Amino acid sequence: MPKLKTKSGVKKRFKMTATGKLKAGVAGKRHRLISHNGKYIRQNRGTKVMSEADAKIIKSWLPYGL
């Protein structure tokens, strides 16, 4: 049986924690930030842990993990 391919877009955008959870950057932070207040910008800095429902779908695109 041939090897399964990993989705290359997924391996670029997500990281896996030591416990197996997925982390990703927050969307909506590229431009037009003047309309958002400082609290929104501060809270969406860095990465966030994905929900279990989303992580299950994303892990199906990573047959061998990251």
Curated annotation (Swiss-Prot):
UniProt entry keywords in alphabetical sequence: Ribonucleoprotein, Ribosomal protein
Claim: Ribonucleoprotein is one of the keywords in the record: yes
InterPro entries for this protein: Ribosomal_bL35, Ribosomal_bL35-like, Ribosomal_bL35_CS, Ribosomal_bL35_sf
GO biological process, alphabetically ordered: translation
Coiled-coil ranges per UniProt: none
Ribosomal protein in keyword set: yes
Classification via Pfam families: Ribosomal_L35p
GO cellular component: cytosolic large ribosomal subunit
HAMAP family (alphabetical): Ribosomal_bL35
Annotated family: Belongs to the bacterial ribosomal protein bL35 family.
Annotated protein name in UniProt: Large ribosomal subunit protein bL35
Organism annotation: Phenylobacterium zucineum (strain HLK1)
